[in-house]
Amino acid sequence: MNKAERYSHLLAPIRIAGHTYRSRVVSAPWGGIWNEDPECHDADPEQLAEIDLRAGGGQAAFLVGETPVTAAGGRGANEFYGFDDQSEEHTRRYRQFAQRIHDNGALALVELCHVGQAKSEIEGEEQPIGPMELTNGDGVFIRAMTEEDVEQLCADFVKAARFCQEAGFDGVCLHCGHGWLFHQFLSPRTNQRIDRFGGSLENRSRLSVMVLQALREACGREFILECRVSGSEHVPGGYSLEDICGYCRYLSQYADLIHVSAGLYQDPSGTWQESTLYEPHGCNADVAAAIRAAVDIPVAVVGGINSPEQAEELIAQGKCDLVVLCRQLTADPFFTQKVREGRPEEIRRCLRCMRCFPGPFEEAWAELNGQFPEGCSINPCADHPERWRVEPAEEKKTVLIVGGGVAGLQAAVTARDRGHEVVLLEKSGQLGGILNFSVHDPDKNDLAGFARAMEAQARAKGADLRLNTVLTGERLADIRPDEVILAIGSHPLQPPIPGLDGANVVLAMDAYAPDARLGHKVVVLGGGLVGCETAVHLWKQGHEVELVEMREELAPDAYRLHKRRLRELIAQHVKTHMGARCLAVTEAGVQVEGPDGSVQLIPADTVVAALGMRANDTGELEALVQRAGVPCHKIGDCVRARKIYDAVSEGYLSALSL
């Protein structure tokens, strides 16, 4: 059996509403159809380039993301393109999207939504509507929907769907989850109506069913109607598994496909709308399986799926018919193509680090002062479509890379893509650098997997990878490189704290090792990202953990939603000492000075130091290379200790510059 045959279920086509899905992998709702120039009716070139990746990478269908059916149906301003004008000029952008998706071999759908009571108040727009009259969390007054509003809503969705159909789309996805309007009617938390739209499950499902029926009658049998639901709300008072299964049975009267997600937009990490690395992969699969058993139409599932092995297993076991990928396609848009070509080991599997998704736009914009992190930690081309064009080098060179962490490996892969000869020297017996600790943390297996994927790519492309090898003058003369790239990483910072070199002190990265000799009671010094993650790991391993941090904020260097989840776990399971300074480490524990100047001893069997990282000194190597008259470049943590994103990006860009 070859590698592709191992994924026979994942790669099998499926017929839905008269259309053939070429595989069982679907690109989750992504982006939207917009152009910042209101006078321009052409599609944004960067969005079209993203389609080439997400649809062209072998996925069966591409869903254009949340598209409000009216101006009042969008969360904020400028989200509504307008479906009243059916002119060629006005539909051109949609036609270009549909055509580009089809050109890449995928089916084209648009996700239609109405946010209901989650609406932000926009001057000049209609009064927001919802199941109940209330004032929402943003202070916006919400008007309870009337029968006339329901009729208008059906008409609005029909108009939008027909617009998409005329533009060449194969179907629409009705967004019935994540706390938007149809979800608000379904949930007993948000719907206490006493008319035919409230009370029983049938009544709470009625609005969704009415809209679906109207869409089916208007668009015909061969127009795909997909419904995206939150399989669970993951909040107190939310609907039950029995409720969501019953709801999906009602939807299946007119829908062709149920798409199972989870949670609420307002709290995406806490409710599993966007699972963090602390939730299981395929976190919605069991709910999807229950729904699949309750309906007689195909079921798709999204939620932390980043491996073809799990995707194949879910389909083979009958838990779902299709898998939906979002962040994974940001990490590697060629997921399906690599599986089909028998290269699954080269897939860059999403870390769920939350770099690419900071959370609810309005909150994140305010908290981050509009400075959203760009791109993906492990894909240097994400958010940079122009970077995918790797041109062959005009002059083929021999490139020597010193250091086999992810910066060096990425440089090796990209240099080989450009046609250079690559020799990589790694002084240890293993590639992956600082990420190798993660193989011992069940929550971080994807980090270790990324290092292995990078190694597999480098080997597949023909890089000469030499382990247990250091750079010497003799070796430099033997290799005769035209360019040298130094990627020798960083090391743990150890400030001059008395006792920090004691036998009861362990460095954070070493604390993950199976042979680490840790006592039951552990104090972690340092509440940055590394310290917080280590504290959570040790708690999960059964230790009693306390954490000491000089600042008043935990994990300020973590990405926003990952930071939120970390803080939740620490608040529940780790005792913290904030604004506290470590004075000394003794055999009995840690002596700290609190923010009020008081001094106390925190008892500890073991002290774990997570006090930052410092760039390794490249001076001797630079001098060696310079004496040979060879151009020398530095990338990654040996420039300055930072994040995986920086290492991968610099590795990629350095190879492009050669």
Language model: regions and residue ranges:
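Short beta->alpha linker loops
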Residues: 305-306, 471, 580, 639
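Rossmann-like dinucleotide-binding cores of NAD(P)H-dependent redox enzymes
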Residues: 421-461, 513, 537-581
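Short beta-alpha connecting loops at secondary-structure transitions
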Residues: 271-277, 321, 435-443, 550-555, ...
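A short helix-to-beta-strand connector/capping loop
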Residues: 319, 458-465, 501-504, 570-575, ...
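Flavin-dependent oxidoreductase catalytic cores
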Residues: 1-402, 406, 410-417, 422, ...
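Rossmann-like dinucleotide/flavin-binding elements
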Residues: 393-425, 431, 466-480, 488-504, ...
